[in-house]
Regions:
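Hydrophobic, lipid-facing positions within transmembrane beta-strands of outer-membrane proteins
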Residues: 10-16, 104-107, 160-164
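Membrane-embedded beta-strand positions of outer-membrane beta-barrel proteins
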Residues: 16, 28, 128-130, 166
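Repeated loop/turn-to-beta-strand initiation elements of outer-membrane beta-barrel proteins
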Residues: 23-26, 116-117
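Extracytoplasmic gating/loop element in the C-terminal half of outer-membrane beta-barrel translocons
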Residues: 33-127
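C-terminal beta-signal and terminal closure region of outer-membrane beta-barrel proteins
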Residues: 62, 66-72, 87-92, 135-170
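Transmembrane beta-strands of outer-membrane beta-barrel pores
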Residues: 30-36, 106, 113, 132-139, ...
Length: 170
C-alpha cells in the first residue's frame, strides 16, 4: 500500500481477559489502525484493464458517471473508458481512501467445571470453550478488508474461524 497525506500510521491493540462468575471466563482482543490512507488501483480505478473483455468490480457497475438516456450525475466513479482515453484514471486524491479500521481479532468464552465434579473421574481440570477469530471489522472502507495490504482488492480476505474446544488437565 502507498501512504499519502498523513504523517504516520497509528496501530493499536487492546486485549482483556476476565474470569467471571462460577467458572466462566472471557478473553477478547481488538486490533486496528488509524490515520491510514491508501490509493485504490486495479480493476476499481481502471476498468477493462485486462483488455476489451476485462472485468469491472460490482461496486463500479451502474455506479459510474454517464450522459444521455441513463445519466448518472451523482455517480461514485468517473465515466468508463477503454483504450487510449485514460484521463479519468490519472493518479489523484480522488482515489485515496481511509484505511483506518478496528477489528475484533479474537474472542474466547470458556467454562471450567467445578473441581468437585471432576475429582470423581481423576482429572484436575476440564474446560470447554468457544473461540472466534476475525469476527467483526469496523471501517469506513467497504470494498475489501483494509488489513489485506492490497490496493486492488485482488487478494483473499482474512479467514473468519470458529473453534469449539475441550481442555483436559490430568
Amino acid at each position: 500500500m502507498r501512504g499519502c497525506g498523513l504523517p504516520m500510521k497509528m496501530e493499536h491493540q487492546v486485549a482483556c481477559g476476565i474470569s467471571l462468575w462460577k467458572g466462566f471466563d472471557f478473553n477478547l482482543h481488538f486490533q486496528g489502525a488509524g490515520k491510514s490512507t491508501f490509493s485504490i488501483e486495479g480493476a476499481v480505478a481502471y476498468p477493462f484493464s485486462q483488455g476489451y473483455w476485462g472485468n469491472i468490480m460490482t461496486d463500479v457497475d451502474g455506479n459510474y458517471w454517464s450522459l444521455g438516456k441513463n445519466e448518472n450525475p451523482n455517480a461514485k466513479y468517473p465515466r468508463l473508458s477503454f483504450g487510449g482515453n485514460a484521463n479519468n484514471y490519472r493518479t489523484s486524491t480522488y482515489w485515496m481512501r481511509d484505511g483506518s479500521y478496528l477489528r475484533l481479532k479474537n474472542l474466547e468464552v470458556g467454562y471450567t467445571l467445578p473441581t468437585k465434579w471432576i475429582n470423581r473421574i481423576h482429572l484436575n481440570k476440564i474446560r470447554v470453550y468457544f473461540m472466534g477469530t476475525n469476527l467483526l471489522t469496523f471501517s469506513k472502507f467497504d470494498l475489501w478488508d483494509p488489513e489485506m495490504g492490497s490496493t486492488t482488492g485482488e487478494k483473499y480476505p482474512l479467514s473468519r474461524t470458529f473453534t469449539l474446544g475441550l481442555t483436559l488437565n490430568l
